[in-house]
């Protein structure tokens, strides 16, 4: 969740330049058109801090065309905004082709971000306020925490929310890899509906040869990050992650092109490629088009869960980038956590089965220390001898969606609570354990056993 490996100059200068213009165009386009921010703020706050090379990028915005073009040392990248689906890098396609692809998108509703969240009070309001302050406090000489939003829910009630300057309850914020958990929920909806079998092979078209050992990879193994596929995850030029996200138009095909590094089901490896294979399986299961996939995400998850700000951005093929590209307000990220806290029920409607909610919380068999479940991170054991939890001051039942820069949607069943923290922390400056422990200490442990 930090950027300790995010040195954009590693992997060769050509890779570094290509990666830099790609990420700059993509972040700028999404930041302006999805999040509603000023281009200058996105460039100075999000892009330039990534590396020395990123400080050289020139980003040009065309509001009427819905594009951002990023250039650096003779290389350029273009990202296109399309209403309803956000920004997409124009790779192996054209602006016109992407606009045509979006013509059949279904309409969306709109409403106030906080309409469904009643207010509540913490057991110790002063202590909660102090904990909230600490999450935003910065060293005046060298600010590096960059918390942008913090939301606390308990029993379905909003106990606290706070935002950094330039952000508000109406600002959709990128989840990075926290998006994986949302993609997992869409897979869970298919499983709940009987449209996808966890134990069935993923049936990637690239693996049709009878002697291809990758044919054995199942939906469950992808969900639990034990597919055995080779994948270099660190965000550095030339890695599989940056190549897939910023240099390929069809991300699932790229992930499917990678060889096995281990027998499926035997080794746990956190990586983004498997998630985008699940994204393609989702689209294939619901009709095979971008419009069908977006409509399914909207009608089956976002609308009934009240996540009406959610924008799940696709690649050029139209497949949602489940590994990385969900934007939503902090309150809607909290609604996502609440859906899981409430056993898959929202607004009196069952969205995910109880079995699925138990599945995503359960430790993946191959994950060391039980640190991973079904597309959710867990508070696993970091020291097998001492049996010390990774976050020792937080409950053992905590599980969470987590992404680069410390995007966190943490679910605490024992406290009937959800804590959402979103930001742009390019170091270890944000102390998740300490911050969330202080918040939990300030709120009354809940005796409620049912959905809030």
Positions of predicted regions on the chain:
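Active-site helix/loop module of the DD-peptidase/beta-lactamase fold
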Residues: 193-230, 257-260, 287-324, 328, ...
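Active-site Gly/Thr loop motif
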Residues: 307-314, 361-418
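Active-site SXXK
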Residues: 156, 174-199, 222, 278-282, ...
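Short, small/polar residue-rich loop motifs at catalytic or cofactor-binding pockets
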Residues: 144-147, 171, 404-405
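Active-site-proximal alpha-helical segments within enzyme catalytic domains
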Residues: 183-184, 273-283, 324-345, 407-423
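Structured C-terminal helix/loop/strand segments within mature extracytoplasmic catalytic/sensor domains
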Residues: 4-16, 21, 42, 398-452
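Beta-lactamase-like hydrolase cores
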Residues: 115-155
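Catalytic-site signature segments of enzymes, centered on catalytic residues
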Residues: 159-172, 235-319, 324
């Amino acid at each position: 969740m930090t950027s300790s490996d995010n040195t954009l100059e590693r992997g060769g200068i050509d890779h570094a330049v290509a990666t830099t213009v790609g990420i700059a165009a993509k972040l700028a386009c999404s930041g302006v058109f999805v999040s509603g921010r000023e281009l200058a703020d996105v460039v100075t706050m999000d892009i330039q801090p990534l590396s020395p090379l990123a400080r050289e990028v020139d980003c040009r915005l065309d509001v009427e065309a819905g594009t951002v073009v990023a250039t650096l040392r003779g290389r350029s990248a273009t990202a296109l905004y399309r209403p309803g689906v956000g920004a997409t890098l124009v790779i192996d396609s054209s602006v016109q082709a992407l606009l045509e692809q979006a013509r059949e998108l279904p309409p969306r509703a709109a409403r106030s971000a906080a309409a469904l969240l009643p207010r509540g009070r913490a057991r110790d309001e002063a202590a909660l306020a102090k904990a909230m302050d600490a999450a935003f406090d910065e060293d005046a000489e060298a600010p590096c925490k960059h918390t942008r939003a913090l939301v606390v829910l308990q029993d379905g009630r909003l106990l606290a929310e706070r935002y950094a300057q330039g952000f508000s309850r109406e600002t959709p914020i990128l989840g990075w890899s926290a998006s994986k958990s949302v993609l997992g929920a869409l897979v869970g909806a298919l499983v709940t509906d009987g449209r996808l079998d966890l134990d069935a092979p993923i049936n990637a078209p690239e693996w049709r040869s009878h002697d291809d050992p990758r044919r054995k990879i199942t939906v469950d193994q992808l969900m639990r990050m034990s597919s055995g596929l080779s994948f270099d995850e660190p965000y550095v030029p030339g890695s599989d992650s940056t190549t897939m996200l910023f240099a390929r138009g069809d991300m699932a095909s790229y992930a499917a092109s990678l060889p096995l590094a281990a027998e499926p089901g035997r080794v746990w490896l956190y990586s983004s490629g498997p998630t985008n294979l699940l994204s393609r399986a989702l689209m294939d299961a619901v009709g095979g088009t971008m419009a069908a996939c977006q409509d399914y995400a909207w009608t089956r998850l976002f609308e009934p869960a009240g996540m009406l700000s959610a924008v799940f951005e696709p690649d050029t093929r139209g497949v949602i980038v489940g590994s990385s590209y969900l934007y939503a307000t902090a309150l809607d990220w909290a609604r996502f956590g609440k859906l899981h806290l409430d056993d898959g029920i929202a607004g009196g409607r069952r969205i995910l089965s109880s079995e699925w909610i138990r599945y995503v919380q359960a430790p993946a068999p191959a994950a060391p220390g039980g640190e991973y479940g079904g597309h959710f991170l867990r508070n696993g054991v970091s020291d097998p001898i001492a049996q010390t939890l990774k976050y020792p001051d937080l409950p053992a039942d905590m599980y969470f969606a987590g992404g680069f820069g410390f995007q966190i949607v943490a679910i605490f069943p024992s406290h009937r609570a959800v804590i959402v923290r979103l930001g742009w922390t390019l170091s270890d400056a944000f102390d998740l354990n300490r911050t969330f422990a202080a918040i939990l200490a300030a709120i009354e442990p809940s005796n409620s056993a049912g959905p809030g």
